[in-house]
């Protein structure tokens, strides 16, 4: 009699497991529970391997010199450090003062899925121009896996240009509050990347800091606030000017502009010479330099200085700036979102620093394709080609759209 009972119990248990699995992957249930599963995995990792602060600069870094020209990956832009051409904008018909208040018609709001603030904010931005998609169509195009925690501005640009080509897309850095108001007054919403703070820890000793995309659709001079369509906190959020600038600084004050083709002359006129990306970067570099001088303890000012120097391929100067930022203390998740330090330390030959940073980044975000890529390049510089190839292949597994990883694999195959 006991054998049928055991068989029945095993059958019921197996059936229950199957049903639970089917229920878990039912989209409404999966969207709710996957957040908790993501949290549980991160917290478990943090208990087993405690998360500390990002590594500070090495006291006497060894510089690896490689005389083979072919040993340098060609995955970074190569602009001139001094702009050779300054764009002359077409002036607006009449430079009238900014209105006291602007409230653009907000697009239909949607709550972001897990790790999806970029696609959600972009979906709302495109919806302002009557696009009929949602965050999931954007995420499906840009992210091989739902667990991908970062979508950068270049990836967002790729989506707009390939899926909403009737709109124009530009981004610049080093923005300021007045510039945001000018675009809003011209009828153009602005999307920015900014700091975000979790409500609770994802691991013991979590500093709670992360990144977030915010869509601005208005401002109010009387109340000194911007209106944000926030995919996490809700629609029509009133955000103080001071908070916007403080949170924005961590991302080099990057701003994204999406607009109709006939609005391009207006955009050029507002940007003036900063329509030229090199000129814009030079201005951002000088602004970051000034901030480091006015407050030498400003971590983000030093980090931004390093990023702008990296853009101009001034790698040794960039690593000096990054060293300052690291010694002052970076947020734990900083290298989940920004990768210019990897580029600067690689090209300056400071491979020990590169490996220390990429290994820390992978401890925080094990599926970061960018950290895997640059950890692989560090391995390559140390002559560990098999380890490098394993990193490159894993980066491509994490994001099958990642062309830099495919380039790296092909590069090793050719050398």
Regions found by a protein language model. Name each.
Residues 1-15:
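N-terminal Sec-pathway targeting helices
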Residues 36-100, 394, 415:
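Ser/Thr-rich, Proline-interspersed low-complexity disordered segments
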Residues 91-179, 185-186, 251-274, 297, ...:
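Cysteine-nucleophile protease catalytic domains, especially the papain-like/related folds used
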Residues 307-316, 320-377:
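Alpha-helical adaptor scaffolds
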Residues 311, 347, 381-382, 411-415:
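Register position in tetratricopeptide repeats
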């Amino acid at each position: 009699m006991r054998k049928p009972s055991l068989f029945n119990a095993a059958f019921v248990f197996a059936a229950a497991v199957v049903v639970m699995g089917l229920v878990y992957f039912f989209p409404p249930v999966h969207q709710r529970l996957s957040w908790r599963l993501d949290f549980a995995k991160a917290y478990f990792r943090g208990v087993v391997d405690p998360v500390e602060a990002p590594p500070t600069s090495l006291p006497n870094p060894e510089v690896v010199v490689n005389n083979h020209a072919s040993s340098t990956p060609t995955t970074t832009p190569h602009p001139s450090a001094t702009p050779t051409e300054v764009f002359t904008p077409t002036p607006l018909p009449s430079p009238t003062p900014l209105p006291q208040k602007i409230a653009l018609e907000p697009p239909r709001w949607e709550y972001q899925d897990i790790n999806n603030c970029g696609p959600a904010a972009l979906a709302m931005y495109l919806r302002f121009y009557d696009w009929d998609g949602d965050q999931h169509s954007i995420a499906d195009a840009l992210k091989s896996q739902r667990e991908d925690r970062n979508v950068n501005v270049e990836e967002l640009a790729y989506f707009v240009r390939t899926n909403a080509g009737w709109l124009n897309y530009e981004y610049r850095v080093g923005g300021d509050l007045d510039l945001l108001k000018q675009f809003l007054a011209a009828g153009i919403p602005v999307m920015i990347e900014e700091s975000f703070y979790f409500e609770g820890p994802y691991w013991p000793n979590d500093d709670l800091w992360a990144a977030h995309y915010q869509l601005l659709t208005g401002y109010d001079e009387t109340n000194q606030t911007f209106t944000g369509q926030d995919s996490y906190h809700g629609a029509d959020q009133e955000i103080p000017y001071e908070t916007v600038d403080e949170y924005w600084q961590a991302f080099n004050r990057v701003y994204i502009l999406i607009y109709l083709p006939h609005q391009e002359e207006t955009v050029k006129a507002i940007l003036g010479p900063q329509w030229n990306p090199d000129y814009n970067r030079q201005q951002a570099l000088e602004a970051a330099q000034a901030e480091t001088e006015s407050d030498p303890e400003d971590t983000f000012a030093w980090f931004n200085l390093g990023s702008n120097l990296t853009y101009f391929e001034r790698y040794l100067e960039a690593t000096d700036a990054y060293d300052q930022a690291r010694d002052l203390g970076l947020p734990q998740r900083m290298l989940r979102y920004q990768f210019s330090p990897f580029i600067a330390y690689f090209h300056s030959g400071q491979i020990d620093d590169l490996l220390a940073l990429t290994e820390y980044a992978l401890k925080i975000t094990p599926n970061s394709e960018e950290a895997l890529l640059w950890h692989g390049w560090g391995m390559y510089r140390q002559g560990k080609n098999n380890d490098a190839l394993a990193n490159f292949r894993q980066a491509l597994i994490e994001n099958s759209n990642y062309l830099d990883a495919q380039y790296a694999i092909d590069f090793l195959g050719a050398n």
